[in-house]
Every structure is written in structure tokens, then in C-alpha cells.
Design a protein with these regions (language model features):
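Short, often N-terminal, low-complexity regions
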Residues: 5-14
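Non-catalytic structural scaffold of enzyme domains
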Residues: 14-15, 20-278
Length: 278
């Protein structure tokens, strides 16, 4: 019995072999929009010679309010798009898609997947107040994977807050808007009153809010996101599979079904990237 493949009846193992025989094939990433570019940046900085293909499914953002079945369906569609572009590894640069769909993706495709999960572990281990906050989507906080992670750290009080509206504002290019500021204050102030000393960002869009978060939070509260950990894991998996591309200039292609200007603005025109519609 062979796993599902978008390439017809060929055995997936054959394609798996081809992916890792061609180290110059790209790293594929997908997210429900522009947020996963925070993960892409971390990967690009750690692995500057790697070609990348990033898929921003902004039309369907946010994933966090969708059902598990919808999230799995969209994640499979995104995966197959990246496989058609010969991705040698796929980074699910979306917390909601990771916590709801990565198990299904790994069961359905032989390409390696890297997921992004809220960094509860380092926050819980290092917290001095034994109280940490997590800001995430509804889809992440209600997922089985997230709740299993929370159960491990029962000695730590974890204050969960759904970031309603944050992804939508980021996707609309309203990072520094009064609406954003108002929402962040309403979400963070109760956590501060509860004496948290760590805030875990449980959505790949949220690192773009760090400048605002730092203005609102007392300086003793540390902010943790997962970008660097995901980049290191991508490096480790490629290294183990002898799949690293170690020289030359990288090509980076970003596909979006949303407003490419938001994508360009969030990358701050700092990177050499080609933008395409899909």
C-alpha cells in the first residue's frame, strides 16, 4: 500500500528518492497568509544557499476559525502545490495547520514535514512565577496536540488567550493601527495582572507584533516565538537526509492569492524575492 501522491500512480518512494538526490530542490513553506514569513526569514538566515518556495494562502486566512477538516483539506492542497514545485521538505509555517493537520500530512505523504508548535516547554521550564501566557488562534488552543503539550506542564499556570482579529489586521496591512493597539491591550492586560513572566506567541503571524507587544508588556516579561527552533530543525532534518544545498545564490519565490503588497511590505523589501499569484 502506497501513500497518496498528486503525481498519479507512481510510487511515492521513487519521488522521495528523487527529492533527496537533488539537493538543489527548494524548501517548501506554507501558511494561511503572510505570517509564516517570520519562519521563512529564520530559515533563510540559517540556510542562505537554499532555494525556497513560500505559499501564502491569504484568501483562506485565518485558519484559526476553521474546522479541523477544513484545515486538513487546505493543508493537503497547499502540500500538493509545493510538491508539484519539487519541494524536498515542507515546513508547515502555521501553528493552526501544524496542530490540526500535520499528523494527517505525515500519514499521507512521504516528504519530511517540519511543524511549528507554541514554545510552551522553554517558557514553562524557565518561568519563575510559574505563570505563562499564550496568545494563539482558536484552532491552535482547541487542538489535541496543544492540549497534550499543556498536560505535561501541570505545575505551571498557562493563561490562554485567543487572538481574535489579529491575523485579519496583519493580513490587511494594519500592523500599527489603533484597532490593533486596542486589541493587544485587551488581550495582554489580564495576563499582566496574573503575573506572567513569559508570553508565548502561538501563531506565526504574531512575531510581527513584537514591537507593539514590548510597548505594552512590562520589561520583565519575555516573549518567545518558534522561528529559530523551526529553522534549526529544518537544518537537522536536511542534514540527516544529506539534503543540504551548500553553495550558490538562492532563489526565493513567494506565491500569494492575497494582496502581494502586504507581503512585500512585511518583508520590508529587504530580501531578493520573486512574487507570483496562484
Amino acid at each position: 500500500k502506497h501513500k497518496h501522491t498528486p503525481f498519479g500512480n507512481f510510487q511515492m518512494e521513487y519521488f522521495f528518492y528523487l527529492w533527496f538526490m537533488t539537493n538543489d530542490n527548494p524548501i517548501g513553506l506554507f501558511d494561511s497568509g503572510v505570517g509564516g514569513t517570520s519562519i521563512w526569514k529564520a530559515i533563510h538566515e540559517l540556510l542562505p544557499y537554499e532555494d525556497t518556495i513560500y505559499l501564502a494562502d491569504s484568501k483562506n486566512a485565518p485558519y484559526g476559525l476553521k474546522s479541523k477538516d477544513e484545515i486538513i483539506s487546505l493543508s493537503k492542497k497547499n502540500t500538493e502545490f509545493l510538491l508539484e514545485k519539487n519541494a524536498k521538505i515542507i515546513v508547515v509555517a502555521c501553528n493552526t495547520a501544524t496542530t490540526n493537520a500535520i499528523k494527517e500530512l505525515r500519514a499521507s505523504y512521504s516528504v519530511p514535514f517540519i511543524g511549528i508548535e507554541p514554545a510552551i516547554k522553554p517558557a514553562a521550564i524557565h518561568s519563575k512565577t510559574q505563570k505563562i501566557g499564550i496568545l494563539a488562534t482558536k484552532g491552535t488552543l482547541s487542538s489535541e496536540l496543544f492540549n497534550k503539550a499543556v498536560e505535561i506542564y501541570q505545575d505551571t499556570i498557562i493563561i490562554e488567550q485567543v487572538g481574535y482579529g489579529l491575523v485579519e489586521l496583519i493580513e490587511d496591512g494594519k500592523l500599527n493601527s489603533p484597532e490593533m493597539n486596542q486589541l493587544l491591550h485587551s488581550y495582554l492586560e489580564p495576563m499582566v495582572k496574573e503575573d506572567i513572566d513569559y508570553l508565548v506567541l502561538g501563531c506565526s503571524h504574531y512575531p510581527y507584533l513584537i514591537p507593539q507587544l514590548k510597548k505594552i508588556l512590562p520589561s520583565n516579561i519575555k516573549i518567545i516565538d518558534s522561528g529559530e527552533a523551526v529553522a534549526r530543525q529544518t537544518l537537522n532534518v536536511l542534514n540527516a537526509k544529506s539534503g543540504l544545498h551548500k553553495e550558490g545564490k538562492s532563489k526565493n519565490i513567494f506565491y500569494s492569492n492575497g494582496n502581494p503588497k502586504v507581503l512585500e511590505a512585511i518583508l520590508n523589501h529587504q530580501y531578493k524575492v520573486a512574487f507570483k499569484d496562484f
